[in-house]
Amino acid sequence: MPSISTNIVLAFITALLGMLIFRSHLMSSLLCLEGMMLSMFILSTLTILNLHFTTSFMMPILLLVFAACEAAVGLALLVTVSNTYGLDYIQNLNLLQC
């Protein structure tokens, strides 16, 4: 495995561990999720370019579209929660209440 791919996989694992460790704050969880999406984008782009998959050149772009949608929804949720409760602790949220 080349060193670039190894570094990207380590970045994904680091973001995943950050997601598991810092799951008490919504902002930290969203940042780790964005790091995971970025490393998945780079790894899929490198894989497609190295293996010459001409039929799947749109896959990284589609991944970026979903990452942008996820970031927009996460930011809207973060703003709503911080305006309502004044903090971004996930433990204080009860999602069953309307």
UniProtKB/Swiss-Prot annotation:
It is found in: Mitochondrion inner membrane. Its EC number is 7.1.1.2. One of its GO terms (molecular function) is NADH dehydrogenase (ubiquinone) activity. It catalyses: a ubiquinone + NADH + 5 H(+)(in) = a ubiquinol + NAD(+) + 4 H(+)(out). One of its GO terms (cellular component) is respiratory chain complex I. Keywords: Electron transport, Membrane, Mitochondrion, Mitochondrion inner membrane, NAD, Respiratory chain, Translocase, Transmembrane, Transmembrane helix, Transport, Ubiquinone. The chain crosses the membrane at residues 2-22, 29-49, 61-81. Pfam families: Oxidored_q2. One of its GO terms (biological process) is ATP synthesis coupled electron transport. It is a multi-pass membrane protein. Belongs to the complex I subunit 4L family. Core subunit of respiratory chain NADH dehydrogenase (Complex I) which is composed of 45 different subunits. PANTHER family: NADH-UBIQUINONE OXIDOREDUCTASE CHAIN 4L (PTHR11434:SF0), NADH-UBIQUINONE OXIDOREDUCTASE SUBUNIT ND4L (PTHR11434). Core subunit of the mitochondrial membrane respiratory chain NADH dehydrogenase (Complex I) which catalyzes electron transfer from NADH through the respiratory chain, using ubiquinone as an electron acceptor. Part of the enzyme membrane arm which is embedded in the lipid bilayer and involved in proton translocation. This is NADH-ubiquinone oxidoreductase chain 4L. It comes from Eulemur rubriventer. The lineage of its organism: Eukaryota, Metazoa, Chordata, Craniata, Vertebrata.
